[in-house]
């Protein structure tokens, strides 16, 4: 089945995420920077990297290798244009993370924010395990159900409405259970709340199973 993400221009996606009533771009970039500061990985992968939101906050003297993975080739092309010169250790891949990930060396830290709402979680967790070093960390962000906001927020960027039918919220407990089954040990969880009323669960897992 064709991914809905292939039909959304990057400008629309970034514009939507930056709309004040949505406010998710700044939240996700800030969280990415915080997690990098917490774990100080020498290598990191961003799943669903789009145009590189938060890549400007990377400390390349600490995180020397950065892997970006996205299903949309236009997103990857724009990310390369923006950051290839600024991040010497940048590796970019056009991949469907629901398929086995091949020829990508494992990393110390994986950031998968607002990814699991659009994929089958368990197979993706298995694929992410293959690119996470033993002892490495997987950080996830899940959107939680809301009585006050629709899953895909209203904005002038109508192409985003195409995501509505593809989106399915995942409970943090279900993700943690799937993660444990494939070899990711639960470390922590916390809640983020935006002014729009939307809430997000931030979870961290450690790859422990050989």
Regions found by a protein language model. Give the residues of each.
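A short acidic, Gly/Pro-enriched loop at the edge of an enzyme's catalytic core
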Residues: 98-110
